[in-house]
């Protein structure tokens, strides 16, 4: 059995789909590291620290899950964490091509690092962080897609963003 796995992502914000995959990965592996990518090129709404806090809250009930922020190459982070498996989620066939290319690149850079793909529960298959942010930006209720504290934080973040735009 592989002991250590990494589930990497930006998690901006963490959704119920992410939480579902984390719970299932926690049953499959002895230790799961949620690797939150700093990834400034994506211009996340939440800071790395806020995303670490959110994931820590969402995974607090899972004893074998650890939340860690990182920057740089994922394969280097995996090596530093002594992880042998990357867990990735596939929501739809459209995700497969990108994930397949990413898995092959990671394998080329680190041949001992395996990629494992999990699909979300049907009720979470359409949820993405991008869609959740879009719904929230237009005043929609996102509470059915994210943890209640994450929904509140997103609402506050968008209100602050709109207030800052109004002051300029």
From Swiss-Prot:
Subunit structure: Homohexamer.
Cellular compartments annotated: Cytoplasm
Keyword Secreted carried by entry: no
Gene Ontology CC: cytoplasm
Annotated function: Reversibly transfers an adenylyl group from ATP to 4'-phosphopantetheine, yielding dephospho-CoA (dPCoA) and pyrophosphate.
Presence of the UniProt keyword Ribonucleoprotein in the record: no
Known pathway: Cofactor biosynthesis; coenzyme A biosynthesis; CoA from (R)-pantothenate: step 4/5
Cofactor: Mg(2+)
Xref: Pfam families: CTP_transf_like
CDD domains in alphabetical order: PPAT
Main location: cytoplasm
GO MF annotation terms: ATP binding; pantetheine-phosphate adenylyltransferase activity
Gene Ontology biological-process entries: coenzyme A biosynthetic process
Annotated substrate binding sites: 10, 42, 74, 88
PANTHER family xrefs: PHOSPHOPANTETHEINE ADENYLYLTRANSFERASE
Protein name: Phosphopantetheine adenylyltransferase
Binding-site positions, ATP: 10-11, 18, 89-91, 99, 124-130
Catalytic activity: (R)-4'-phosphopantetheine + ATP + H(+) = 3'-dephospho-CoA + diphosphate
Enzyme Commission number(s) from the entry: 2.7.7.3
Family that this chain belongs to: Belongs to the bacterial CoaD family.
Site (Transition state stabilizer): 18
Enzyme class (EC, first level): transferase
Organism lineage: Bacteria, Pseudomonadati, Pseudomonadota, Gammaproteobacteria, Alteromonadales
Entry keyword set: ATP-binding, Coenzyme A biosynthesis, Cytoplasm, Magnesium, Nucleotide-binding, Nucleotidyltransferase, Transferase
